[in-house]
Amino acid sequence: ISRPVAVRAVAPTGTIGILGGTSTGIEPIFAVAYKRRYLKNRRWHFQHVVDSAAQEMIELYDIKPDKIESALDLAEDYERRLNFQANVQEYVDMAISSTINLPGWDTEKNNEDGVEKFTQTLAKYAHRLRGFTCFPDGCRGGQPLTPISYEEAIEKLGEEFEDNIQTHDICDISGSSGICGV
C-alpha cells in the first residue's frame, strides 16, 4: 500500500464558500456587504448580501461594519496579502490558490507607476507561492460580486431584483459581436 504524498491542503473555495455561506479557506471576506449577480431563466438577477462571517462579528462581538477588514481593504496592501499566503504555504503540502484583489486599473492605487513596485513585490514572494490569481476591481464587465454599503444591504436584504437586460446564450460567439460573455 502506497503512502499518501500529501496530507494538508487548502481548497480554492472562494466562490464555493460564498455560495454555501461558509468559510472560504484562507481568503479574506470579499466585502462586508455586496451585490451578488447571477443568471436565472436567461435573465440577470441580483441580491444584496451581508457576508455571514461579517454579520456574526457584528452581532456577537459588536464590531462596527467599517472596522471589518475585507479583501478590498487588503487590495491596497497586496504585500501583506502575499506574505500571509507565503507563510501559510510553508505548512501546506499542496498548492494554495488564492485571489489577490487589487484596486481598479488606472486609479491612484493601481496605475503604470505602480506596476514596477508590484512586480518587485511579487518577485520577492514568488518562490514561496504555488498558485494565485490577481484580480483588479472592475476588470471584468458584469462582475458576479460588487461591494455595497452595509446599510444598503440590510435595507434590501432578502429581496431579489431582476435586471432589464435579457441574455442570450452567454457563450454564443457566432453573433455579430463575436464576444463570449456579457
Predicted regions and their residues:
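Catalytic alpha/beta core of large soluble enzyme barrels
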Residues: 3, 8-174, 178-182
